[in-house]
Amino acid sequence: DRDPRRVVGSSFGVGELGLNLLFETRETIRMRRAMRTQLALAQLLCGSAAVLYAMPSVFCYNPLRTHIEVLNPDANGFGELCITMLDSHAVIALPRYATGDLGRLVSPHETAQAAAMAGTASPWLPLVAVQGRIKDRPAGLPSVESIKELLYLDHAIADELSGAFRLAKNATGGIQLSLQANQAGVATPALRAQLMDHCTRHGFAELEVELFEPEDFPWRPLLDYERKFAYVAAATD
């Protein structure tokens, strides 16, 4: 909003299909921001899922380039994204590619209504709301997206963390959230107390927080560009 000539936005791509398949615009960014303060807007785009999970990303897509479906949608309209590229000259077509991401198609009526509630122009391209990876929403644990959003709600706390964390059930059946500090000497009892208070204030009082120095974090992320960091412990861990 400060610079009419420049937009810093997110996009969504799939390695097998292409980059920038879904993308933010000024209008979708304004809509997503407004969802944080307008529950009615969040429920319009997400249904009851708005109060259970992190706010989804709101993306546009080019219907002349991609055909998007949602497989097995739930009561709120969220299901697995399925994308077909419409390029007739593609070397490998890969029709109806299921991405493993949770998404919801937004109708033109919902788009116009949401834009009006957010005080912005209605995007002229169709919208899809994306909630993150399906595998990152294990039963009995918070979603990875909700933990990321929780940590970045407080910029001062987020500045002390690397962004790597691990969710797991502990021996007593509780939920353990293990976090990696971003530098040596940061993992103090005071920061842990801040984190626990932060979790409680934002509806995650059940989390048992453990804070690690960078080199002591057992699942320390390596510079492996072939694999994504595993935020959720496997059942056998």
What are these regions (language model features)?
Residues 1-237:
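Active-site glycine/GP-rich loop and adjacent strand/helix microenvironment
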